[in-house]
Design a protein with these regions (language model features):
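A cross-family phosphate/adenosyl-ligand binding-site feature
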Residues: 1-99, 105-170
């Protein structure tokens, strides 16, 4: 996501939770420093005074990727104990776009109720599920589909996956 946004010259503000950092080291070949270098600005998740914790800080929206069920629950219940949860709460109260890339499976009734609660507030629940009509060949193809779906929500042009209806898939 950050690589694509940097290429497109989109300003980004990165908040990485402790578990987000663990995901990066366990699931990718990237270093934390490399990921931080992709963002315009970074903030520590414990810094509740960061600019993004205030509604006066103008942003187009927020993407939480990946979004754990713990973070989903915190946001759904207004428990702003981290900068991620606080910033998400601010994004909701300021009526800005919030996208949660949840990836837990299977989902419990509690998870679904929290998602429904947030969806009713206008939060976009966008699990990184690929569309197989795109005929993904690599993990990057699958990742790019999820990234592209997020960018679509912000009307950011990209060519990360083939659109339905082009000559490749009709």
């Amino acid at each position: 996501m950050l690589e694509t946004l940097k290429t497109l010259n989109v300003e980004t503000h990165l908040i990485m939770s402790e578990w987000g950092q663990k995901c990066i080291t366990m699931e990718t070949e990237h270093t934390i420093d490399y990921v931080k270098s992709l963002a315009t600005t970074t903030s520590d998740e414990k810094n509740m005074a960061a600019s993004v914790s205030s509604g006066t800080h103008k942003i187009d929206g927020m993407i939480i990727a990946p979004c754990s069920m713990k973070t989903l629950s915190a946001i759904a219940n207004g428990y702003d104990d981290t900068l991620v949860a606080r910033s998400a709460g601010v994004t909701i109260k300021e009526d800005r776009k919030l996208i949660l890339m949840v990836r837990e499976t299977p989902l419990s009734a509690i998870h679904l109720e929290n998602m429904l609660k947030l969806s009713r507030l206008g939060v976009i629940i966008l699990p990184p599920v690929t569309a197989f009509y795109t005929h993904p060949k690599t993990i990057d193809d699958i990742v790019n589909h999820g990234v592209g779906k997020c960018l679509d929500q912000f009307d950011i042009d990209h060519d990360l996956y083939p659109r339905w209806g082009n000559s490749q898939n009709t």
